[in-house]
């Protein structure tokens, strides 16, 4: 049996610890985390800010006490300051000043990611916020109790930025959404889908400023008052910056581990790093992108983090399983418009030099004679021109089509071709779908 030290009790770390404790007896598990809480579901922050849920209690699914009841030792508010990989020792200091020198047989790095915060002039003004941790969301909500905060700008129109824009609008604030890209969610969807969301945002009263880069912030009496871009100045009372995340790699950025181009730890299919007995999971590590032939990449999603933690936990304890890679399956629901995607978009394929074809269709999910709860759905499938393997899909509707993307995720993982999809066995019942399902119709239209 082994002594296993886990640095970071976030989603990936939590999944790893639970996998070890629930399936293998006799191991000593010691965890360190710099935060005061475990397992906060950051995806729920926008719902909380937007008053779509009553509070944050349901956004936690694991506690220190639950870990300890299973036999783990957990040190909260105890950041790890140094790791001696040669001698297998972790050094940390608790909030009360207690020093820890913890030896290990196996080490799991689960340090997560950090928000990318550009150094804008005026960036230290009050009411310029970031949203990553529970404490960040609580601070925003507390500040929104101040009725003088009437106008909020969100910088960054990816998933999180779009969700926050909706949240601030639902909270009763005038809301601006700013991004230097020509539209929103450009990394997840092709323009025709992104424009659906952009129109949806505008129709719901959000002031969109795409194609504008932030230049600096201005303030008065220490508080932000103005957002200045390359195209204009906008009066604001709060700014939320959410332009992306980077691996939290301060503990291993000194060349002791092999790293990816963006600083994430390179891992193999067992979550092993370049050092013996050291594993990395979650946002601090790479994934294998099946839509790009299984090459290493970086996709910071909680779902990826959990899977990587499970894989590492089993391999550490002697059960050899491989991470099958990911397709980046994701989704978003804003003002009732639901959009899901996985794999490559057409634009992404062009960036990566992949020669692709696409097929698209807009149709109802159910039979056309169903008069209620049967809105249009738009689907786009991206497939390899030569091999005809499906590489990605995007779907948008006010109807919940999210389950369909799971099928496409598996199709990308398994190399299913567009031609195989044409005759997929999809049942027909008017309550559920049409005789020619929109998926089948799109496949049949493929060149």
Name what the model sees in each region:
Residues 2-73, 165-189:
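Beta1-alpha1 glycine-rich phosphate/pyrophosphate-binding loop at the start
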Residues 7-11, 19-26, 34, 243, ...:
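Flexible, glycine-rich terminal cap/loop adjacent to redox cofactors
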Residues 26-28, 68-95, 101-102, 170-267:
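A Rossmann-like FAD-binding core segment of flavoenzymes
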Residues 59-60, 151-153, 159-218, 299-304, ...:
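Rossmann-like dinucleotide-binding cores of NAD(P)H-dependent redox enzymes
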Residues 102-112, 236-244, 309, 388:
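Short hydrophobic core segments
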Residues 109-171, 207, 261, 267-269:
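Glycine-rich dinucleotide-binding loop and its adjacent helix/turn
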Residues 124-148, 221-226, 233-311, 411:
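FAD-site-proximal beta/loop scaffold in flavoenzymes
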Residues 281-345, 432-447:
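A conserved FAD-binding loop/helix module that cradles the flavin
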């Amino acid at each position: 049996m082994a002594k296993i030290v886990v640095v970071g009790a976030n989603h990936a770390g939590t999944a790893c610890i639970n996998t070890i404790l629930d399936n293998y007896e006799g191991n000593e598990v010691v965890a360190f985390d710099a935060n005061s809480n475990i397992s906060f579901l950051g995806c729920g922050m926008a719902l909380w800010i937007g008053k779509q849920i009553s509070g944050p209690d349901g956004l936690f699914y694991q506690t220190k006490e639950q870990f300890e009841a299973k036999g783990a030792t957990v040190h909260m508010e105890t950041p790890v300051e140094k790791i001696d990989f040669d001698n297998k020792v972790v050094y940390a200091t608790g909030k009360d000043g207690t020093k820890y020198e913890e030896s290990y047989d196996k080490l799991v790095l689960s340090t997560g990611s950090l928000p990318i915060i550009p150094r804008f002039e005026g960036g230290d003004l009050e009411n310029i916020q970031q949203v990553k941790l529970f404490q960040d969301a609580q601070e925003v909500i507390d500040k929104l109790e101040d009725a003088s905060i009437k106008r909020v700008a969100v910088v960054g129109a990816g998933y999180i930025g779009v969700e926050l824009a909706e949240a601030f609008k639902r909270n009763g604030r005038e809301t601006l959404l700013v991004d230097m890209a020509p539209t929103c969610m450009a990394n997840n969807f092709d323009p025709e889908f992104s424009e659906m969301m952009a129109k949806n945002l505008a129709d719901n009263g959000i002031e969109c400023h795409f194609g504008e880069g932030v230049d600096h912030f201005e303030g008065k009496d220490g508080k932000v008052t103005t957002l200045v871009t390359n195209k204009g100045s906008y009066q604001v009372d709060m700014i939320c910056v959410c332009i992306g995340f980077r691996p939290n790699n301060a503990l291993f950025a000194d060349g002791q581990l092999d790293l990816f181009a963006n600083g994430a730890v390179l891992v193999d299919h067992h979550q092993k790093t370049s050092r013996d007995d050291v594993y990395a999971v979650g946002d601090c590590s790479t994934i294998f992108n099946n839509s790009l032939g299984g090459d290493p990449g970086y996709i910071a999603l909680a779902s990826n983090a959990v899977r990587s933690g499970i894989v590492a936990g089993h391999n550490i304890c002697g059960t050899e399983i491989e991470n099958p890679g990911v397709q980046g399956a994701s989704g978003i629901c804003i003002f009732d418009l639901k959009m899901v995607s996985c794999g490559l978009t057409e634009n992404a394929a062009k960036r990566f030099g992949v020669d692709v074809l696409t097929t698209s269709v807009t149709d109802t999910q159910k039979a056309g004679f169903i008069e209620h709860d049967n809105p249009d759905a738009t689907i786009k499938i991206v497939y390899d021109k030569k091999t005809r393997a499906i590489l990605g899909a995007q779907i948008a509707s006010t109807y919940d089509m999210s389950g369909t993307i799971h099928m496409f995720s598996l199709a990308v993982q398994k190399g299913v071709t567009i031609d195989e999809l044409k005759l997929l066995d999809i049942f027909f019942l008017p309550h559920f779908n049409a005789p020619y399902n929109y998926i089948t119709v799109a496949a049949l239209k493929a060149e």
